[in-house]
UniProtKB/Swiss-Prot annotation:
It comes from Acinetobacter baumannii (strain ATCC 17978 / DSM 105126 / CIP 53.77 / LMG 1025 / NCDC KC755 / 5377). GO terms for molecular function: carbohydrate derivative binding; glucose-6-phosphate isomerase activity; monosaccharide binding. It is an enzyme of class 5 (isomerase). This is Glucose-6-phosphate isomerase. GO terms for cellular component: cytosol. The keyword Cytoplasm applies. Coiled coil: none annotated. It comes from the Bacteria. Pfam families: PGI (PF00342). The gene is pgi. It is found in: Cytoplasm. Its EC number is 5.3.1.9. Pathway: Carbohydrate biosynthesis; gluconeogenesis; Carbohydrate degradation; glycolysis; D-glyceraldehyde 3-phosphate and glycerone phosphate from D-glucose: step 2/4.
Length: 556
């Protein structure tokens, strides 16, 4: 946004004025000074809940800052908005819909919303039945062979969430009657499919078409390609489509029209946003990988956080704290980029998942009342598995000119379960896990304390280009271990963080109008590239020039 616009107009509300005052008062305060002044700072600025610990002591905050952030949340009626979210209110104001992803993880015996719970569990039970059938080797393709490969075709929320969770929980893959592999395809250019189809047998491959609207061109173009691949190998008859495709969508009629058998149609609802949908039948690939019990544990972990979010005071409420720390960094300290750094290779796709969750939800510039925002909203979210990131962009974090806030994420335990395939190598692998943990702690320490973290003797003659300023804020999330339950907790924490920030910024986190128009313009350009239309006069000079090169009318 323009530098002339205040991050928060100072005159609006008392907590905002107080926070601006605290910024000016503490502008030169270093994180190392906060720790020096408060010996029990870790105890005062960390929360333990269930299977995780949230340490936010390495942020540039004081008790006074926290008090005013809580006061800001109260002036924005955060408690009221949380109550609205967990009702059936239409908190998605631009589409006049509720946002009830939390309902997808309600226990079957939950009594507050009996009809809603029944709808959700009816679809989950249908999904579980298919999972059991595939696992038992009883689901067969058109030629009678057992399915051994399942390909999820989706994009955005129908791809990022399921792929992230499936990869993260690879240690919990269940045994099946015959080996079962799950794959993911999302890109509309066909490159992923081209590589994958060479490895698969049509007779033993099942495809999931995962699309809330069943109209997304990325997904349907890939689906049409694999349909042709199947029909070329197995023949053009209804049995091929009915045996080799499962659909997940809100649009039963569109799935039927495409040829998907009713018994292979799993339903969603309009009140589930795509980026919040992995808890639903969109999570079919997850259930295929970790089994029904594992999937239910994933839901249970998220539900535990739902209860924590609704029933815990702001002072101990982890999603609220995560959100308010982000507000402080973004809107008051002018830190507008946030790195997510998991120190576990299984969380390889977690940063990409959060990019959609946070930036598609809160990357908005219009308030709920239709007025332009008067403050910066979502920061740029990025990240990578921590040990790899250390050899890529940590140079910028430590010695660059950009202020960056970070989330460090790590499991406390790993390689200690006897059902894992690597149990015979556990001792060596545990040492590697400790190596990752030591790096996680070292990096957060160095980012916070800078030169203070170095040995004084070493620092004495250290040239300036080897020195560290520090004062880069970070949180650390420690999971007891990375399992379905704790991962469900972790994801739900970030979901609710996003919601809290949307309340403070007065924006709608449940729509994504910014992604719509580009698709429509692409539809207008496609006939030109296909040769069905020649008139370029309505286009800008750049687009005209690029199209001429693509059509071979001028040299590139």
């Amino acid at each position: 946004m323009s530098k002339s616009i205040e991050k928060f107009p100072k005159e609006l509300v008392s907590p905002i004025a107080q926070l601006h005052s605290l910024v000016e008062k503490n502008s030169k305060l270093h994180i190392k000074e906060l720790f020096a002044a408060e010996q029990d700072r870790f105890q005062n600025y960390s929360v333990k809940f269930d299977q995780l610990v949230f340490d936010y002591s390495k942020h540039r905050i004081t008790k006074s800052v926290l008090e005013q952030l809580f006061a800001l949340a109260k002036t924005k009626q955060l408690t009221h908005w949380i109550e609205r979210l967990f009702s059936q209110d239409k908190v998605n104001c631009t589409e006049q819909r509720a946002a009830m992803h939390w309902a997808l993880r309600l226990p079957s015996e939950y009594s507050k919303f009996p009809e809603l719970t029944k709808q959700v569990h009816t679809q989950l039970q249908r999904m579980y039945a298919l999972v059991e059938k595939i696992h038992a080797g009883q689901y067969r393709g058109a030629t009678g062979e057992v399915i051994q490969d399942v390909v999820n075709i989706g994009v955005g929320g129908s791809d990022l969430g399921p792929q992230m969770v499936t990869h993260a929980l690879c240690d919990f893959k269940v045994k099946t009657a015959k080996p079962l592999n799950v794959h993911f395809v999302s890109t509309m250019d066909g490159s992923q499919l081209s590589d994958l189809l060479h490895q698969l047998r049509p007779e033993t491959t099942l495809f999931i078409i995962s699309s809330k609207s069943f109209g997304t061109i990325d997904t349907l173009s890939n689906a049409q390609t694999v349909r042709q691949w199947l029909e070329k190998a197995l023949g053009k008859h209804d049995r091929v489509v009915k045996s080799h495709f499962i659909g997940v969508s809100t649009k039963a009629e569109k799935m039927t029209e495409w040829g998907i058998a009713p018994e292979n149609q799993l339903l969603l609802w309009d009140w589930v946003g795509g980026r919040y949908s992995l808890w639903s039948c969109i999570g079919f690939p997850i259930a295929l990988t970790i089994g029904i019990d594992g999937f239910q544990q994933l839901l249970a972990g998220a539900h535990a956080v739902d209860e924590h979010f609704q029933n815990t005071s702001f002072e101990q409420n982890i999603p609220v704290l995560m959100a308010l720390l982000g507000i402080w960094n973004n809107n008051f300290l002018n830190i507008q980029t946030h790195a997510v750094l998991p120190y576990d290779g299984r969380l390889k796709y977690f940063a990409a998942y959060l990019q959609q969750l946070e930036m598609e939800s809160n990357g908005k510039s219009v308030q709920r009342d239709g007025q332009k925002v008067e403050l910066d909203t979502c920061p740029i979210v990025w990240g990578e598995v921590g040990p790899n990131a250390q050899h890529a962009f940590y140079q910028l974090l430590h010695q660059g000119t950009q202020a960056v806030s970070c989330d460090f994420i790590a499991p406390i335990q790993r390689y200690n379960a006897d059902h894992f395939t690597y149990v015979e190598n556990a001792e060596a692998l545990i040492e590697q896990h400790h190596l990752a943990l030591s790096n996680c702690l070292a990096q957060s320490r160095l980012l916070a304390f800078g030169n203070e973290a170095l040995d004084s003797a070493e620092l004495k003659n250290l040239p300036i280009y080897k020195q560290y300023e520090g004062n880069q804020p970070s949180s650390t999330l420690l999971l007891k271990e990375l399992n379905p339950y704790s991962l469900g907790m972790l994801i739900a924490l970030y979901e609710h963080k996003v919601f809290v920030q949307s309340v403070i910024w007065n924006i709608n986190p449940f729509d994504q109008w910014g992604v719509e128009k580009g698709k429509q313009i692409a539809d207008q350009l496609l006939p030109i590239l296909n040769g069905a239309q020649n008139d370029l006069s309505a286009l800008d000079a750049s687009t005209r020039g690029l199209i001429k090169i693509l059509l071979g009318k001028v040299d590139g």
